[in-house]
């Protein structure tokens, strides 16, 4: 950011903000940012931004926010909730949006100092961006196994700076062209305001249809001494195209406690075709229907230091 790379829209510390029916194109930095505001409505906003690095579509670090009916096509994260200050990003509802990205479509983080509370996201579609001049994951990270431009993660929930993610519902999402449909990461990178371990509690992800490309499975991972707690994932149809032999599977996944959170952060092919779960206390998988279109010899689930795990109605074809 700064004077050399301004955002197109930037509200900070404002009350009762409404942005509606505008088109924003090719920002120098983040396209629009709402920081420490109270009472924000963003409706019917169209974003097309593929001019620079850091071309996020919509960044929210505010309270009492409604986002609806937006079309976002950008190079960096499409919808990004941030927590850069000493107050949490909370009471946020997002619905009826089209999200296209070369990075993450729905993301909490990376900045996660205070956290994210009471958030619902529903009725959205996710797809690969229209352009890819910068990232080109298929060229720069060939081990991922993608052949085209892709979204990094459809849903990425990241708390790594001492903040908390709690009371979150994400539902009715259709996604295609993604590397990893669901990425949940509790890390221990920085502690500024809370001086305590990051936390992720009470999250529900439901009614998801996803077509993924490449070898990086979904992952839900905490760190030693920092468990993710009370996660429910239900009613998911997942179709993957990964081709992985048993000899390619690496059971020694590094902890990467303070690394930048991203689906490829472990630097290896995860030992699950569906969900790799580690350092979690309380997780339920209900009605997960997974289909592999190529020969993937990994099991659907791989668990490491997981307590109170349940699964019901989960199938792998």
Question: Which stretches of residues belong to each language-model region?
Answer:
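Extracellular/periplasmic carbohydrate-active domains that bind, remodel
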Residues: 1-317
């Amino acid at each position: 950011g700064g004077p050399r790379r301004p955002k197109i829209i930037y509200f900070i510390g404002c009350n009762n903000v409404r942005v509606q029916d505008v088109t924003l194109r090719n920002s120098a930095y983040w396209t629009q940012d709402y920081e420490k505001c109270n009472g924000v409505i963003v409706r019917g906003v169209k974003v097309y931004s593929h001019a620079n690095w850091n071309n996020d579509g919509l960044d929210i670090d505010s309270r009492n926010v409604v986002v609806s009916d937006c079309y976002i096509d950008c190079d960096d994260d499409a919808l990004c909730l941030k927590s850069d200050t000493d107050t949490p990003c909370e009471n946020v509802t997002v619905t009826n949006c089209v999200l296209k990205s070369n990075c993450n479509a729905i993301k909490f983080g990376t900045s996660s100092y205070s956290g994210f509370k009471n958030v619902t996201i529903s009725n959205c579609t996710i797809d690969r961006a229209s352009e890819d001049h910068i990232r080109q994951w298929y060229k720069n990270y060939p081990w991922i196994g993608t052949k085209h431009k892709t979204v990094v993660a459809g849903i990425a929930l990241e708390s790594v700076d001492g903040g908390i993610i709690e009371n979150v519902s994400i539902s009715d999402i259709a996604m295609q062209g993604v590397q990893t449909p669901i990425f949940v990461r509790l890390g221990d990178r920085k502690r500024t305001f809370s001086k305590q371990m990051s936390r992720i509690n009470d999250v529900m992800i439901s009614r998801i249809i996803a077509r993924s490309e490449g070898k990086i499975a979904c992952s839900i991972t905490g760190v030693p001494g920092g468990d993710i707690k009370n996660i429910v994932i239900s009613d998911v149809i997942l179709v993957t195209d990964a081709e992985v032999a048993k000899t390619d599977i690496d059971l020694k996944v590094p902890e990467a406690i303070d690394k930048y959170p991203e689906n490829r952060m472990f630097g290896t092919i995860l030992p699950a075709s569906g969900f790799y779960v580690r350092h979690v206390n309380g997780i339920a998988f209900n009605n997960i229907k997974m289909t592999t279109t190529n020969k993937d010899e990994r099991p659907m689930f791989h668990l490491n230091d997981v307590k109170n795990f349940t699964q019901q109605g989960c199938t792998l074809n």
